[in-house]
Amino acid sequence: MDRWVNSNQQAHWDKRTFYRDARDPAAEAFSVPKIDWFCAELGIDTDATVLDVGAGTGMFTYWWSQRMPEVTGLELSENMIQRSAVPDLLQVGDAYELPFPDDSFDIVFAASLLHHLERPVDALREMRRVARRGVAICEPNRNHPPMAAFGVVSSVCRGLLHYSRHSLRGLAEEAGLDVRNVRLHGYIYENRSPTASVPIAKKLEAVLPGGAYILLAAAP
């Protein structure tokens, strides 16, 4: 198996112990609006199959499964799968060589994956290969000050400093994807926003431009 990430990153994911439970209200507030937007942009409602690449502990996998009939999560770290709320939906696999035939899933999705990869365009090409109807990508926004600060202090996440709306679109187009829309979204942080802060963060999301994450919807 070709390793997605370098040895330092792999050690981090294999040893990390804290992850927010997928069913936490903050996880729902973080995940569901993004899923709703992707479905609207790709013209997909509730009857679709989904592959979540780099699923981690399955936060998005869980919320996709609340909407779609068939969801599969692919993750490199067995440690993360063991800590998942939905381990039955996850399997070990390689983002550079997805173990599925062409056109296997309606939607191929990845969140906070590409900035950890040494060859993100190769991974996007694989996602395009197995997608029938759409590819949906969520990445941290380097132009969001708290996210940029996190990228500076965290060696594992330093790759996020390369990601903006423009750069993510460029990677997707280099991989041959037909980009439909790119937007910024979110003032809730995946594993860092206290649950009590969610109501305030939702109000900020409703009125403030920008956001901590870049969302890209594309056709294969």
Give, region by region, the residue ranges found by the protein language model:
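Short alpha-helix
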Residues: 160-177, 181-182
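Conserved beta-strand signature within the Rossmann-like core of class I S-adenosyl-L-methionine
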Residues: 133-140
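Class I SAM-dependent methyltransferase SAM/SAH-binding core
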Residues: 57-97
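A conserved beta-strand element that flanks and buttresses the S-adenosyl-L-methionine
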Residues: 109
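A C-terminal cap/extension of S-adenosyl-L-methionine-dependent methyltransferases
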Residues: 180-220
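Conserved class I S-adenosyl-L-methionine
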Residues: 1-43
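A short, conserved alpha-helix within the catalytic core of class I
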Residues: 117-126
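Short, glycine-/aromatic-enriched active-site segment of Class I SAM-dependent methyltransferases
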Residues: 142-158
